[in-house]
């Protein structure tokens, strides 16, 4: 999702790499789950996220659509996002994966395979011509006395360099699609979105995600940018 605020308004002003040490760890959150009580459908899911959810829950994309995820328009493109459910005893909504009972009450039910957006929070990415940097968002996480840790440890993603290359490739591809969409009529915009969903989300990935994704991306570019 695009945001219009300036970098100075949103961040602490620093630009970080995966090996930078930042004060970001809330020490297990200790009963806080405000970031899971979102009011808008802002947790957009990329292909890696969907692959992780599908494998972690043992469900297909179509099965996830029954409860866990939904489709929405994000800056002109139809993309999946985490579903939100109404709170049982209060007003507002929370993430469908926020535990509501027992020892998992107030805890993430999919923490080991949570989406990239959730792993990154309260950090973000600043995309520039040569790649991207990590940034620390201000006033996003209310937890006090955060501990220092490396960005790499905070993300907790295996093969992080490969993941970062994928993230940059996906971001660049989606940005190019967004540039192209205004030139299309409404019917063609719908067709492009459905083509993207079918190509990158609906069809299950092979065991080697990055290789499979690369092959799909090459084919899609050949169709859309020929």
Regions found by a protein language model. Give the residues of each.
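Short loop/turn segments that flank or connect secondary-structure elements
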Residues: 1-226
């Amino acid at each position: 999702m695009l945001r219009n605020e300036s970098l100075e308004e949103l961040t602490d002003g620093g630009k970080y790499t995966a090996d930078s040490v930042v004060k970001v760890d809330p020490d297990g959150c200790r009963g806080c789950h405000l970031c899971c009580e979102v009011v808008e459908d802002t947790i957009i899911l990329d292909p890696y996220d969907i692959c992780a959810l599908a494998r972690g829950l043992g469900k297909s994309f179509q099965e996830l659509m029954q409860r866990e995820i939904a489709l929405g328009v994000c800056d002109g493109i139809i993309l999946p996002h985490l579903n939100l459910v109404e709170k049982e005893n209060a007003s507002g909504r929370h993430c469908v994966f926020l535990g509501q009972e027992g020892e998992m009450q107030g805890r993430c039910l999919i923490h080991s395979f949570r989406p990239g957006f959730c792993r990154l929070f309260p950090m973000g990415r600043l995309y520039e011509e040569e790649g991207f940097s990590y940034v620390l968002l201000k006033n996003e996480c209310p937890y006090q006395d955060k501990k220092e840790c490396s960005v790499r440890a905070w993300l907790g993603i295996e093969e992080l360099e490969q993941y970062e290359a994928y993230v940059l490739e996906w971001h660049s591809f989606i940005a190019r699609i967004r540039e192209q969409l205004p030139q299309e009529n409404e019917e063609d915009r719908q067709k492009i979105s459905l083509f993207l969903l079918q190509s990158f989300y609906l069809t299950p990935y092979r065991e080697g995600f990055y290789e499979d994704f690369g092959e799909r991306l090459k084919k899609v570019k050949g169709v859309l940018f020929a």
